[in-house]
Amino acid sequence: MQIFVACPRGFCAGVERAIETVEIAIRRYPEKKIFVYHEIVHNSRVIQDFKARGVDFIEDITKVEPKSVLIFSAHGVSEEIEKYVKSLDLVLVDATCPLVSKIHREVQRFEKEGFIILVIGNRNHAEIIGTVGRTKTQAYIVQDPEDIDNLPSITGKLAYVTQSTLALEYTSTMINKIKEKFPNVVGRSDVCYATQNRQEAVKALAKEVDLMLIVGSTNSSNSRNLMQVSSKICQKAFLIDNYNEVEPDWFEGVDRVGISSGASAPEILVQDLVSFLKKRFPSAEVSDFKFKEEKVQFKLPII
């Protein structure tokens, strides 16, 4: 058996920055309670590890305690949440991914210039909620083609932005449909470099293997999209949180296995999976499937 591990995979620069932010806060404020608004990243292993060290993840901002440390997750927050928190007696640290913050500025620029804004993405995702919450006027969330069909007639200036972790094919389809209905719309895809690189690497790898295993949590948008990309090409494709979820019958008739991981999945989970497969198949050969090198790094926020 041959095992190919996609490169790039796993943590992106925004996730690394967010996780390191929490790590530094734990060390810098040992006497303070640390809260994170939303999961810092969408991965169960990361969240469980931080919870074991006393970090409290909250969805209700009013649950934050005075004199504590509050960290915004990588997904960003609305302007209303930010203003509310700044009125409280606590230490605020913003771990919003810089590429998400860029989308926030884009939305605010469009609004200032008098555009009505379409936001393409999952209406229940923290990033989309935060992005829409950066506008003071009407913004429409479009999650599927039917949402575009149901949009009212818009005669003024119209612009769109997108969630940063969407599937490339889906994003292209949605943008093209918007342009068909509103030929004068302006905007561009905001799908980030890491999402694009991981999807393109998985697309190339899936063509070469009999089985694709994507490591990531089910609430991770980018992990689910890697799974969808894989399943359109490779007949056997599965999304797993860790190696314990692997089923023996998946390997029937399989000679070549491809592995990748979502941008919020720790590398240790991939290595655990590889070790598990090598124990199960002692003669298996493991190699990297090199698609593209990433060198992006972001500065840490002020902590």
From Swiss-Prot:
Query: Quick one: which residues bind isopentenyl diphosphate?
Result: H42, H75, H125, S220, S221, N222, S264
Output this protein's name. 4-hydroxy-3-methylbut-2-enyl diphosphate reductase
Per the UniProt entry, the signal peptide is none
Q: Which UniProt keywords apply?
A: 4Fe-4S, Iron, Iron-sulfur, Isoprene biosynthesis, Metal-binding, Oxidoreductase
| EC numbers for this chain | 1.17.7.4
Catalysed reactions, semicolon-separated: isopentenyl diphosphate + 2 oxidized [2Fe-2S]-[ferredoxin] + H2O = (2E)-4-hydroxy-3-methylbut-2-enyl diphosphate + 2 reduced [2Fe-2S]-[ferredoxin] + 2 H(+); dimethylallyl diphosphate + 2 oxidized [2Fe-2S]-[ferredoxin] + H2O = (2E)-4-hydroxy-3-methylbut-2-enyl diphosphate + 2 reduced [2Fe-2S]-[ferredoxin] + 2 H(+)
Residue positions annotated to bind dimethylallyl diphosphate are H42, H75, H125, S220, S221, N222, S264
Q: Under the GO molecular function aspect, what terms does this record hold?
A: 4 iron, 4 sulfur cluster binding; 4-hydroxy-3-methylbut-2-enyl diphosphate reductase activity; metal ion binding
HAMAP family referenced in this protein's UniProt entry, alphabetically:
IspH (MF_00191)
A Gene Ontology biological process annotation?
terpenoid biosynthetic process
Q: What does this protein do?
A: Catalyzes the conversion of 1-hydroxy-2-methyl-2-(E)-butenyl 4-diphosphate (HMBPP) into a mixture of isopentenyl diphosphate (IPP) and dimethylallyl diphosphate (DMAPP). Acts in the terminal step of the DOXP/MEP pathway for isoprenoid precursor biosynthesis.
Q: Where does (2E)-4-hydroxy-3-methylbut-2-enyl diphosphate bind?
A: H42, H75, H125, S164, S220, S221, N222, S264
Which positions are annotated as binding [4Fe-4S] cluster? Answer: C12, C97, C192
Q: Which CDD domains match?
A: lytB_ispH
| Gene name, Swiss-Prot/TrEMBL | ispH
Q: Which family does it belong to?
A: Belongs to the IspH family.
Task: Give the EC class as a word.
Answer: oxidoreductase
Look up the record and name the cofactor or cofactors this protein needs. Answer: [4Fe-4S] cluster
Q: Where is the active site?
A: E127 (proton donor)
* Cofactor note as given: Binds 1 [4Fe-4S] cluster per subunit.
The protein's annotated pathway: Isoprenoid biosynthesis; dimethylallyl diphosphate biosynthesis; dimethylallyl diphosphate from (2E)-4-hydroxy-3-methylbutenyl diphosphate: step 1/1; Isoprenoid biosynthesis; isopentenyl diphosphate biosynthesis via DXP pathway; isopentenyl diphosphate from 1-deoxy-D-xylulose 5-phosphate: step 6/6
